[in-house]
Amino acid sequence: MLKILNMNEYISLNHYLILSSLVFTIGMFGLFMNRKNIINILMSIELMLLAVNINFVAFSVYMQELSGQIFSIIILTVAAAETAIGLAILLIYFRNKGSIKITDINKMRG
């Protein structure tokens, strides 16, 4: 007989937490290493947010509640809107100034 295995028999909560911490660390490393390009900074922040969402979903499945998964979907929706607005502002700034370097944007403060 063919036995259908549950995914949680092989992948425990610790595996998800390790994956999440690795993704968060990669995002943090990218944030610290690429401080001159705004697009790299936005991508690193999105990686860190993805790691948090992996934690929400993993704990939600572990506790057998849907609230973490629903919260994760809401966070992803807000993050997508935030990224779209940020990239639109960045595109307008690039059309006006011709550069998206952090040092050029800091000069706008006055």
Swiss-Prot record:
InterPro entries: NADH_UbQ_OxRdtase_chain4L/K (IPR001133), NUOK/Mnh_C1-like (IPR039428)
UniProt main location, coarse: membrane
GO BP field: ATP synthesis coupled electron transport
Gene Ontology cellular-component annotations: NADH dehydrogenase complex; plasma membrane
GO terms assigned for molecular function: NADH:ubiquinone reductase (non-electrogenic) activity; quinone binding
Localization, UniProt: Cell inner membrane
Record keywords: Cell inner membrane, Cell membrane, Membrane, NAD, Quinone, Translocase, Transmembrane, Transmembrane helix, Transport
Spans through the membrane: 13-33, 41-61, 73-93
Protein's UniProt keywords contain Cell membrane: yes
Membrane topology recorded in Swiss-Prot or TrEMBL: Multi-pass membrane protein
Catalytic reaction(s) noted: a quinone + NADH + 5 H(+)(in) = a quinol + NAD(+) + 4 H(+)(out)
EC number: 7.1.1.-
Pfam families recorded: Oxidored_q2
Keyword Transmembrane on entry: yes
Gene3D superfamilies per the UniProt record, alphabetical: 1.10.287.3510
Subunit architecture: NDH-1 is composed of 14 different subunits. Subunits NuoA, H, J, K, L, M, N constitute the membrane sector of the complex.
Similarity comment text for this entry: Belongs to the complex I subunit 4L family.
Function per UniProt: NDH-1 shuttles electrons from NADH, via FMN and iron-sulfur (Fe-S) centers, to quinones in the respiratory chain. The immediate electron acceptor for the enzyme in this species is believed to be ubiquinone. Couples the redox reaction to proton translocation (for every two electrons transferred, four hydrogen ions are translocated across the cytoplasmic membrane), and thus conserves the redox energy in a proton gradient.
This protein's name: NADH-quinone oxidoreductase subunit K
Gene name as annotated: nuoK
